[in-house]
A protein has these predicted regions:
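Extracytoplasmic gate region of multi-pass secondary transporters
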Residues: 29-31, 257-322, 383-387, 391, ...
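Extracytoplasmic
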Residues: 10-45, 100, 145, 282-287, ...
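Primarily marks hydrophobic transmembrane alpha-helices of the MFS/SLC 12-helix fold
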Residues: 79, 131, 345-348
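C-terminal ends and interior cores of transmembrane alpha-helices
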Residues: 84-124, 349-366
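Multi-pass alpha-helical transporter architecture, strongest
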Residues: 207-215, 358-364, 449-479
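Cytoplasmic helix-loop-helix junction between adjacent transmembrane helices
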Residues: 130, 134-174
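Residue-level signature of mid-helix packing/kink "hotspots" within the transmembrane helices
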Residues: 27, 56-64, 143, 177-178, ...
């Protein structure tokens, strides 16, 4: 090829679509459980909290091994395995009702809804375990998405562009969450909640067919010109492993134990642990929050508008990955060196302040539900901007050969933090409603939500301080 190509952005678009499908699959339960699944299986907030927390812990544990698996299998095959498993898991949710009916000895959903006493308890228990199995399969596959995506970004983008590329594909989470309330409740309403899982789950198999024909490593891709390859590898000499084949067994790699001896690893791990649970809480609980506190269902026009607005605001995060590049370019124009880690930490500090607006969600919610939705949307946008940059710190400081492994370890920490958040939230909401507890002028379940919002608002600043303390300056790890 004699002209410069931009195929790296096609790959970025594929990562974007994979992440969008990932979050669509993840959102089906949160948008159907309160209105469709809860009455059929006699669930309460504790059941839902248990399911989301188990999903988080399975996701966390699998993230630890998913990164290592992707490093071993290679980006192309590793991504195919991941999305194939999670798509199968998504479709498997549709079988939970049939299995529950068979175990309990009932014949249809109407009989399950009308059940009372011990039968209702049995239905709730059996169905919960069925969903736990399906959810675990989903978590197993979804755990591979971000390790594979971050590894792909490191292969196709120079360091200065990685946060921006990450913010673009990470925005797929917002797009998936954005389209979810416009499609999933309607599918559930007209086709049944089971078909909502199946239809959304099939999207992953379509993505797999496209990925097979498009992806190859840039140095082997027929779609990447020499000029584009030179751009991709512009900082090659700064990466001690970038001249090595990422998928060959002779390259130097880090074991789990070796990774844990580096402060850079612990900074990433703690940053993920402190903040991932916030995003997952908003993702899993906002539809229920609107229904519980304001009586707004996701199938209502108002509910759709509110959820759409929340994730439309979250889309602003796409600019969050551009901020470090602006800092670096500005410093270079002035003749000063500005390392990528310093640029990312400066950007992350800015983003850490925005979630503080969530502290006002409950007080302003007394005026209109639009206020908490807008404020939560700002918090979600800040999280996604933070997430794009914290993921990119891995590529800045670790060799390419172990990026997926390190990302997986950090993802495990984020999943554990999320598991803790989901379980505590579910139990707190049941407790606050049962005891009519009060907190800063709010009573019952709204008081429980206010407590969780306070935790969400402050987690980022605490996480940033710990990260900066552990790794005050940029230092590349060499093997």
């Amino acid at each position: 090829m004699n002209t410069k190509t931009n195929f790296r952005w096609v790959i970025c678009a594929m990562l974007f679509m994979a992440t969008a499908v990932n979050y669509l699959d993840r959102q089906v339960l949160s948008l159907t459980w309160d209105e469709f699944i809860k009455p059929e299986f006699h669930w309460n907030e504790s059941h839902y909290g248990t399911i989301t927390s188990i999903f988080s812990i399975v996701y966390a544990v699998c993230m630890l091994f998913a990164g290592k698996f992707v490093d071993w299998m290679g980006t192309r095959k590793g991504y195919l395995w991941a999305i194939g498993i999670w798509s199968a898991g998504a479709c498997a949710h549709a079988l939970c009702g049939v299995v529950t009916e068979s175990v309990v000895g009932l014949h249809n959903s109407t009989e399950m809804i009308q059940a009372v006493g011990d039968t209702a308890v049995l239905i709730s228990t059996v169905s919960m375990y069925c969903f736990l199995v399906a959810r675990s399969i989903l978590a197993l596959g979804e755990a591979g998405n971000f390790p594979a995506a971050i590894k792909t970004t490191a292969e196709y983008f120079p360091k200065k562009d990685r946060a921006y590329a990450t913010s673009i594909f990470n925005a797929g989470a917002s797009i998936g969450a954005l389209f979810a309330p416009l499609t999933i409740p309607l599918l559930a309403k007209h086709l049944g909640w089971e078909m909502a899982f199946v239809v959304i789950g099939l999207l992953g198999f379509i993505w797999m067919g496209i990925w097979v024909f498009l992806y190859d490593k840039p140095e082997h891709s027929k779609y990447v010109s020499k000029e584009e390859l030179a751009y991709i590898e512009q900082d090659k000499e700064l990466d001690n492993s970038s001249s090595e084949d990422l998928d060959t067994p002779v390259e130097k790699k880090l074991s789990f134990r070796q990774c844990l001896k580096y402060r850079q690893m612990w900074a990433f791990v703690i940053g993920k642990f402190m903040t991932d649970g916030v995003w997952w809480f908003f993702l899993f609980w906002t539809p229920s929050y609107l229904n519980t506190q304001f009586g707004i269902k996701t199938t209502d026009p108002m509910g759709m508008a509110l959820i759409f607005t929340l994730y439309a605001i979250t889309m602003l995060s796409i600019y969050g990955g551009k901020l470090p590049t602006l800092f670096i370019n500005s410093a270079m124009k002035k003749g000063r060196e500005f390392d990528p880690y310093a640029a990312r930490m400066k950007a992350m500090l800015i983003f850490a302040f925005f979630p503080l607006v969530v502290l006002l969600a409950q007080p302003l919610g007394r005026i209109s539900p639009w206020f908490p939705v807008i404020l939560i949307g700002i918090g979600c946008a800040a999280h996604q901007s933070w997430s794009a940059n914290i993921f990119s710190t891995v590529g800045d400081m670790f060799p390419k050969s172990c990026i997926a492994t390190v990302t997986g370890i950090g993802g495990m920490a984020g999943g554990l933090g999320s598991m803790l958040m989901q379980k505590v939230a579910g139990e707190l909401f049941v407790y606050s409603a049962a005891t009519d507890m009060t907190f800063l002028g709010f009573r019952g379940m709204p008081a429980g939500y206010f407590i969780i919002f306070c935790v969400c608002a402050t987690s980022y600043l605490i996480g940033w301080v710990i990260m900066k303390t552990l790794v005050p300056k940029y230092k590349v790890i060499t093997l």
